[in-house]
């Protein structure tokens, strides 16, 4: 009872602080994840144009560029780009067909590789791009029929089951993890993704009659059905995590689990939680170290949000917890939440030291019906850039400090910077660079307002101030690796 009382007091105390010190709490940390999900299923966020000609292809690409430009302008640093939906993909795969949303035809060729394009455009803007992959659901009967012979239900029928008029990969089949890893391997080997992000790595809701009894009898080995199912999901994730780290150890492996792990000691999940309802042992995954990040889908408010966010934080095992915020509820047709609901949640996330937040979904950051959320982020919460949180459990050694920073002030008012390259302890991990600017010397790199560019690839950068009176006098450059380790600065001479 004392523990319950203490938890309640902590939540109440924190919420009181939020109301009194909201301006202070919105002070921006140098490192946090600022993510947006870009949903390609049904073209919800992108694309809205079908690529059936050279002109329409460029229009389709321009739609994504416009979205990325707006997210970059708001200092987002992470894009969760949906690269696999329901047994079809948005990249050139040898295993599954191209999604029809691109051209109007199953496995149609849009004339470019959407995932490669998304990665390239994100990196141009200093943002990470994670390949968001729906894992087990394969779609309803109509969708599967449309894929025809290219559907996994035809190419690997023994891995698939039908349940409530939908098809799923069977997590209880021992070869399912290998099939999923074959898809992940394509993505990680062929593309310069910063992460792979797994969605729907769970059983369907109310899955008591899910048709896996044969596999359970064969492989249950005395475990309860519930525990066997949890172990199946854990084994899939364990296998993928280990294999990804063999290929590119810096690639982040994450999931988007159900937003509440279990009932807390005081607050009920009302039957909808990861552990019991859909068999996700997420805290077990964190404890075992087979997750770098989790993005729990915390599309709730009040006591359905705050105590469960604390629960994730307290069980994180040093891994990154980035709550997913249901910003779509701000829309009048979705829930018409008031903007201060999301504002309180973001303040709470910073006050409690979580690792950032993700916004579901990108279109609701673009529309005006979300009650000014985008402007709020630009003006108060994401005014300055933020670096990615580091991953010391993978690598804690910073690159060497770049040297020889040369500053050339040009007649057009721009400043051209160049420097000598840094070196990293991992020869496959070429360092990137962060550029800082200030009107005082030496430049204080602990202050996020001094960041003018991050994840710069190459050893040159041209700085142009937006406003003439914003022109900075002094510059510094650091090297940063893909684990988030940052070197000491190379300061430009005053």
Segments predicted by a language model, with ranges:
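Active-site-adjacent "subsite" loops/lids of carbohydrate-active enzymes
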Residues: 31, 39-62, 131, 136-190, ...
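Active-site clefts of carbohydrate-active enzymes
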Residues: 38-40, 251-271, 308-344
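Polysaccharide-binding and catalytic clefts of secreted carbohydrate-active enzymes
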Residues: 67, 76-77, 84, 125, ...
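Aromatic-lined carbohydrate-binding/catalytic grooves of carbohydrate-active enzymes
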Residues: 74-110
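Substrate-binding cleft of secreted/luminal carbohydrate-active enzymes
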Residues: 282-305, 319-393
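Pro/Thr/Ser/Gly-rich low-complexity, intrinsically disordered linker/stalk tracts
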Residues: 372-428, 484-494
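Solvent-exposed loop/turn segments flanking beta-strands in beta-repeat/beta-sandwich domains
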Residues: 422-448, 472
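Beta-strand-rich modules
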Residues: 463-486
């Amino acid at each position: 009872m004392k523990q319950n009382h203490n938890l309640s007091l902590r939540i109440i105390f924190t919420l009181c602080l939020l109301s009194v010190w909201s301006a202070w709490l919105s002070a921006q940390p140098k490192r946090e994840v600022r993510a947006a999900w870009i949903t390609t299923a049904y073209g919800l966020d992108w694309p809205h144009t079908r690529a059936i000609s050279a002109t329409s292809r460029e229009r389709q690409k321009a739609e994504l560029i416009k979205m990325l430009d707006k997210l970059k302008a708001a200092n987002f640093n992470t894009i969760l780009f949906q690269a696999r939906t329901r047994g079809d993909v948005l990249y050139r795969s040898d295993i599954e067909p191209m999604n029809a949303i691109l051209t109007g035809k199953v496995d149609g060729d849009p004339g470019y590789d959407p995932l490669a394009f998304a990665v390239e455009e994100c990196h141009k803007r200093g943002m990470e791009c994670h390949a968001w992959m729906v894992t087990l659901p394969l779609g309803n009967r109509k969708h599967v029929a449309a894929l025809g012979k290219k559907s996994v239900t035809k190419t690997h029928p023994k891995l698939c089951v039908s349940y409530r008029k939908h098809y799923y990969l069977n997590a209880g089949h021992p070869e399912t993890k290998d099939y999923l890893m074959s898809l992940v391997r394509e993505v990680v080997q062929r593309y310069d993704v910063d992460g792979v992000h797994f969605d729907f790595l769970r059983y369907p809701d109310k899955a008591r009659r899910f048709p896996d009894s044969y596999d359970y009898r064969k492989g249950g080995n005395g475990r309860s059905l519930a525990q066997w199912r949890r172990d199946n999901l854990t084994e899939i994730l364990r296998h993928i995590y280990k294999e990804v780290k063999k290929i590119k150890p810096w690639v982040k492996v994450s999931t988007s689990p159900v937003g509440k792990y279990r009932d807390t000691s005081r607050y009920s999940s009302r039957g909808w939680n990861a552990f019991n309802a859909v068999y996700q042992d997420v805290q077990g995954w964190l404890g075992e170290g087979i997750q770098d990040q989790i993005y729990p889908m915390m599309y709730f408010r009040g006591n359905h949000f705050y105590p469960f966010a604390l629960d994730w934080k307290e069980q994180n095992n040093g891994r990154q917890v980035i709550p997913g915020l249901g910003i779509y509820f701000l829309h009048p047709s979705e829930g018409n939440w008031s903007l201060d609901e999301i504002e309180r949640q973001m303040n709470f996330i910073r006050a409690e030291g979580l690792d950032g937040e993700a916004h579901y979904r990108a279109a609701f950051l673009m529309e005006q019906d979300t009650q000014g959320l985008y402007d709020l982020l630009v003006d108060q919460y994401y005014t300055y850039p933020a670096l990615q949180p580091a991953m010391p459990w993978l690598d804690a050694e910073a690159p060497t400090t770049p040297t020889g920073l040369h500053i050339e002030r040009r007649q057009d008012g721009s400043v051209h910077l160049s420097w000598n390259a840094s070196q990293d302890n991992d020869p496959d991990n070429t360092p990137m660079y962060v550029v800082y600017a200030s009107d005082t010397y030496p430049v204080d790199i602990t202050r996020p307002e001094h960041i003018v560019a991050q994840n710069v690839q190459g050893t040159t950068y041209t700085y142009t101030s937006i406003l003439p009176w914003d022109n900075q006098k002094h510059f510094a450059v650091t090297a940063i690796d893909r684990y988030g380790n940052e070197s000491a600065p190379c300061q430009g001479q005053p």
